[in-house]
Amino acid sequence: MASHNENDDIPMLPISDPSSRTRARAFTSRSRSVSLSNPTSSIEGFDTSTVVLGYTGPLRTQRRPPLVQMSGPLTSTRKHEPLFLPHPSSDSVGVSSQPERYPSFAALEHKNSSEDEFVLKHANLLRSGQLGMCNDPYCTTCPSYYNRKAAQIPTSRVSALFDSTFHNALYDDAKGWARRFASSVNRYLPGIMNPHAKEVQTWTKFFALSCLLAIFIDPLFFFLIKVQEQNKCIMIDWPMTKAFVAVRSVTDVIFTMNILLQFRLAYVARESTVVGAGQLVSHPKKIALHYLKGKFFLDLFIVMPLPQILILWIIPAHLGASGANYAKNLLRAAVLFQYIPKLYRLLPFLAGQTPTGFIFESAWANFVINLLTFMLAGHVVGSCWYLFGLQRVNQCLRNACGNFGRECQDLIDCGNGNSSVLVRATWKDNASANACFQEDGFPYGIYLKAVNLTNHSNLFTRYSYSLFWGFQQISTLAGNQVPSYFLGEVFFTMGIIGLGLLLFALLIGNMQNFLQALGKRNLEMTLRRRDVEQWMSHRRLPDGIRRRVREAERFNWAATRGVNEELLFENMPDDLQRDIRRHLFKFLKKVRIFSLMDEPILDAIRERLKQRTYIGSSTVLHRGGLVEKMVFIVRGEMESIGEDGSVLPLYEGDVCGEELLTWCLERSSVNPDGTRIRMPSKGLLSSRNVRCVTNVEAFSLSVADLEDVTSLFSRFLRSHRVQGAIRYDSPYWRLRAARQIQVAWRYRRRRLHRLCTPQSSYSL
């Protein structure tokens, strides 16, 4: 009588139930390498998610019957997971067996740890919801897997994990009332935002327009001061002053909001922008330090409300209504002192260019921006001409006051009411003061037209004529102006000439070069599109294929920027090419067999990598077809669909067609006695369909290149380490081991059943 063991009642590899259903769970590890496989089995954790496992065809050795070679993955980050094929039961004849599902604590733990790692890495962006997502379908900076993962992970889990991890570090358990208040306020603040989010891009365009308004508004403060020819004095237009101060305050508020936005806006690390890829830095502390070390203090100086403080507080409180003359000098100093840094900071936005790319991409938009820049130069020159002309009128009145013989300095300010009516009437009739408003009364030079303009009551008229004068002088390089002997006037004329030359040399030349370069690229694209359209029309391709061809051409242009990297490498030294390829193709070492190879072999492989682009819904490999290349995904998402319908997603850093490497290595392998293993010339067949979910940038390695490398370095393949890695990572040997275990266990069950049957009959 055989003893009844408890473990014998529970089969180690039970027969799969035909009614069971499996679902393929997406791998969350970013370091895996998954490729094509045979009908897969799965291991199910307590969360009912399944782990998809793939298989490959046989690794042929000597004295083996011929088998059809199938494709499957070589490497996986999941270790110690049993692989097996579902075995149909006796009572399920004629019904296709379903993959078996088994509880696995390791799978559940690995899933949770992988998702937690993703959540911790991108917790700040995930908390922001839509503001943390990239809305650019042709983005070459943000990781394309982010949006999909962000949609799969619930916000509640993100918040809980983020709060438990970062709350103590950020707020020190909120021991003080200030920290508790900051902790409560932080819940209502927006999270870290993606620079490519739709809302952020809309704000950037709005901020660019507000920068244009801010640059135009500052010189307008000069037109608030005018001359009263009747009273021979200078005054401030206080009603218009309040309107200008309000507009300037609005632009300052917008700029302040943009400063606050920079502390919540993720940025792309420069060192990560390789092969079109980029890593978004979303840690709040790193973002704050990056901005503080950058242009924070310059932005803080620009946003300081100096004109508002002068007009609303300093002039009324200390100078009173008679402060027009002093206001002129203070405004000139404050506006010009703050205007130069503002131009340096805001002109890139005015040009439509930011660290994340162009704001206005069309040629006409850039043409309008360059035209507005030319208008800005005329606006600044005309405003300064009006201010300096007003200063020359003030100087003429001061000279007339010196010849007046009485204390009349206060009379130059219209708001002064301390002087008697008789003295003011005498000042009005002074011949020297009246001569200041005549053409030959004072050497005004280039400011002669500004004399009568300063006493015009209509502000729009004063500004329009000044703008016209500025345009005229920039366009003619001040060729029709002859300055007087006043040094300030001479230097101002020289500045106009230099600015005009600079605009023609840089702005006009830059606009011309930009239009020519843009036209050249557009011409190339237009010619290529025309050739493609003519070819498709000649071949009478259907509309669906034509649409895919157009999308492929567009994405290929967006991915390569019209630059052929192979042509760039041709004129570079060999060592420089090798170093560049080592830097670009670091993902090769994610494949386990490649990680065991020496650098010379990897360099030979890197030289043979070719850049490929695929559009969404493109088929990379199909079931029953030959596996002719290995594809390394750089950006985008693919999915591998098995024969049983299981779906396996592939992201950046993954590889499809990796079994091709083992197939080529086996063809170059040797037996322990040193003889070469004979392999048939038939190619490797794929058992899965691999298609693109999104647009994909990748590098491919053809089977001919792999065979070339293995033939060149065949000596290296005799290493026991490489041979062991080939057999360890081979899905065929794993499949064979799983089958042997299943056969042995079924044999043991039958023996136990035979031993238990006589005992049961005897007991009855």
Swiss-Prot record:
Which PROSITE patterns is this protein grouped with?
Answer: CNMP_BINDING_3 (PS50042)
Residues involved in a nucleoside 3',5'-cyclic phosphate binding: 593-710
Q: Which InterPro entries match?
A: cNMP-bd_dom (IPR000595), cNMP-bd_dom_sf (IPR018490), Ion_trans_dom (IPR005821), RmlC-like_jellyroll (IPR014710)
Coiled coil where?
none
Query: Which keywords appear in this protein's UniProt record, sorted alphabetically?
Result: Calmodulin-binding, cAMP, cAMP-binding, cGMP, cGMP-binding, Chloroplast, Ion channel, Ion transport, Ligand-gated ion channel, Membrane, Nucleotide-binding, Plastid, Thylakoid, Transit peptide, Transmembrane, Transmembrane helix, Transport
Bias category Low complexity: which stretches? 19-33
GO BP: any one term: response to nematode
Task: Define the transit peptide region by residue numbers.
Answer: 1-25
Function summary: Probable cyclic nucleotide-gated ion channel.
> Where is it localised?
Plastid, Chloroplast thylakoid membrane
Region (Disordered) location:
1-40
Q: How does it assemble?
A: Homotetramer or heterotetramer.
- Write down the species: Arabidopsis thaliana
Residue spans, topological domain Stromal? 26-204, 264-295, 351-366, 510-764
- Domain called IQ: residue spans: 734-763
Lumenal side stretches: 226-242, 317-329, 388-488
Record keywords: Transmembrane helix included? Answer: yes
Main localization (coarse) = plastid
Identification of the protein by name: Probable cyclic nucleotide-gated ion channel 20, chloroplastic
One Pfam assignment: Ion_trans
Q: Where is region (Calmodulin-binding) located?
A: 713-729
List, alphabetically, the Gene3D superfamilies matched.
1.10.287.70, Helix hairpin bin, Jelly Rolls
GO MF annotation terms: calmodulin binding; cAMP binding; cGMP binding; monoatomic ion channel activity
Q: How does it sit in the membrane?
A: Multi-pass membrane protein
Q: Cite the source lineage.
A: Eukaryota, Viridiplantae, Streptophyta, Embryophyta, Tracheophyta
Q: What would be one Gene Ontology cellular-component term for the protein?
A: chloroplast thylakoid membrane
